[in-house]
Amino acid sequence: MKRKAEKQQSAAPVSAFAARKARQQAQIAATPEPVKPPSAVETTEEPPSKKARTSPEEDTPSQSVSPADRVQTRRSSRRKAEPSEIEKTPRRKTKTTPATPPEHLTDGTVGRESGIQTPVEEVSEPEGNDVPLDDADRYESPADTPALVEAFPLSKTRLNKSNIVYSDEHTLCVRIKEKLSLVVIGHYDVWVKRGVISLMGAKLHPSPRLYRVYAPSTHSLPVIKCVSGVDGAAEVEIKSCHSGIYRLRDLSPLYQRIWNGSNTSADKLTLKNAEPHARRTFSVLYTSTDDSLKRHLRPLHLEKQWSSAIKSLSQKGGKLRALICGPKGSGKSTFSRYLLNHLLSPAPQTEPSYCNTDGVAFLDLDPGQPEFAPMGQIYLAHLRSPVFGPPFSHPSLEGSQDGTVIRAHHIGASSPKDDPDHYVLAATDLMDRYRALLASYPQCPLIINYPGWIFGLGLEVATWLVRSLGLSDVIYMSEKGPAEVVEPLGQAAAAARIPLTTLPSQPTDFVSRSSAQLRSMQMQSYFHMTRPADVSTPLWLDQPMSRTRPFKVHYAGPHQGIRGIMVMGSQIHPDLLHEALDGSLVGVVAVESPNAILGHSEVPGLANGVMGKQPSPAEEGSEDAVMDEATEMVPTAPLASIDSGITRSPHEDLPYLFVGAGSCNPLDPKASHCLGLALVRSVNVAARQLELVTPIAASRIRDALQQGYGIVLVRGQLDNPNWALSEEYYAARAAEKRHRRFVDSSRKDKVDDGTDDSAHTSAILKDRIRRASHVPWMTVIEDNSRRQREAAQREKSLWKLRKKAYPGSESEGDW
């Protein structure tokens, strides 16, 4: 059982058992006589009271529980009785005002049978907090501790008659004075009419172009700041846009309550001449208390050291080759995005020596949270225009006018730690593609985003990349070390004769979505986004995956469309391939050569395989193997043929591709590339067909086949697509609620709504909800009050030990 201790900067973290034993000894020594009422001095030496996550039942009287409930909570009550005298006084002395109880659990809860639950939220519900973390995703964060929503200042500009140029129900044009700013939540288009503004690192000048901005509450809000202008002010038009991304709230509660809520005071001022119920897709916020949904909103401000570093790096122009690394949650992605936008839109007044016409190359080596691709991929992208929004607003660049993905490789996991050899080979191949890109765009700088895998084996990979990729700069996003990371990076940078810049981290104070939830949001956005040929911006469709028309691909017979099905990781029996494939996410990989599988190395491992040499006897006993800088990046064995590795499953005749001993050897990055992801909706054994749902354009697959490439489906270790299983249920609930609203509105306005037809429609919609709730691998809990009470009791009875990510770190996590 864990206990929670206060986070102390000076003391090193201790185990829960040691902390408990120390407290027991102190209690025995301090209380030889019967316990007396403790004084104020004594309370300071005792463990702090638990700041538990609030629940609707927290303030309700305790209810009698059944024997079954007592069995589940017996362990908690026994642990709680032990320090009863210790707990009473701290709970009286330390008073915290609880946050507003979340009221998102309205009708039911849907989740996987494994115990992962997804809360059911009403779309128009104005109260409550953001979507809570699932049981599998719960963690201690600063978001758990604040009691009230702080009145945090957002905008430095107050709208009035003098700075409002014009406004209507769709558009707002304002003047922003120099060094003042405006914060807007929602999604909108920005048109700079006069002056120069800064937005997420980009400096935008007057032009006829509109820039699409996505500013949800899941991330810090972009700040529109006037840099210079005519008569000391810039004139900016902000216009509502209808991309359809808000429709995803009907498919997942993770997309609910992330855009603008009711009209703010600034909105009401600018909508005086509009219809009474007019609403834009954005809202102007002066402070965080202006938000009707009472969320913890913060502006996206940069540290001065960040701004100086971005300006210094931008001055290198086309010679820039920067690797950005650091611990998890230190702001690597934010810094990369700001640097990218700054390079794509330099200010001519301050940087006359550099004019970017060749774009910027973005090498994303983070398969867990990629910027322009779905999870599980690393890629090289060529950007030509700044981007304004979180990753789930641009999960793919396919068909985009702002940039293209030059080449991508499927890692098949959110972390490269399971197969670092393949990861390094893929990164090296992408770097070779960048060098080839320089032939067409010689002044194209490069930004490399490295994942938070910076300790242990990840540090070895990072130092190898620093020595091998021909970089110009290395940026480490933490001033607090640790030394065992910074020193090897500094030595590698010194060996490569490049500077190592250390910047302060900029972690998020409040977290409304966990990393797993953000990955689900990005994956869901990826599968629902489309780019029509005649539209310059993406659109999102709210049709559930179960109602999307799939691609039907033959996996056997004369019209076989795929060469094989590969399962990364440990070998499985061919009889289990059907179960492993059905309902999973797979990478669609184009194989450029029949011999595209890396051969099996007799001495596996990172230091012995691709990146290092054979260790000496003295090195074999050490934990950290020494890497050989001169080792050439080549496979350790000849490539194997795909056809020779095919084994047909006995019942379904599926082409199981496996080469290796114990674990499957991956595809060679130099002879293959990833086209995207697909969801295997079903396996039609009778027709020997796979039903695939994928956003990959049919023209890309057709072009790959016309070039003689084979298609291989790679089943990796990506997160289960739980969001796809529950989409139909949430869509059915949203449709039923819209119908209920329509009926209520008709009755209120005394309009004949056709009672018989309404009742019939309502019955059909309720039946749709009933059928959608019977999806396999999903359980709908209609009454979850008991579950909430049990969870609240568990939270109150637990003391969690909060550990630092590393010595001197302000963030928390596994160390």
UniProtKB/Swiss-Prot annotation:
Residues 122-134 have a biased composition (Acidic residues). Belongs to the Clp1 family. NOL9/GRC3 subfamily. GO terms for biological process: cleavage in ITS2 between 5.8S rRNA and LSU-rRNA of tricistronic rRNA transcript (SSU-rRNA, 5.8S rRNA, LSU-rRNA); rRNA processing. The keyword Nucleotide-binding applies. GO terms for molecular function: ATP binding; polynucleotide 5'-hydroxyl-kinase activity. The gene is grc3. Keywords: ATP-binding, Kinase, Nucleotide-binding, Nucleus, rRNA processing, Transferase. GO terms for cellular component: nucleolus. This is Polynucleotide 5'-hydroxyl-kinase grc3. Polynucleotide 5'-kinase involved in rRNA processing.
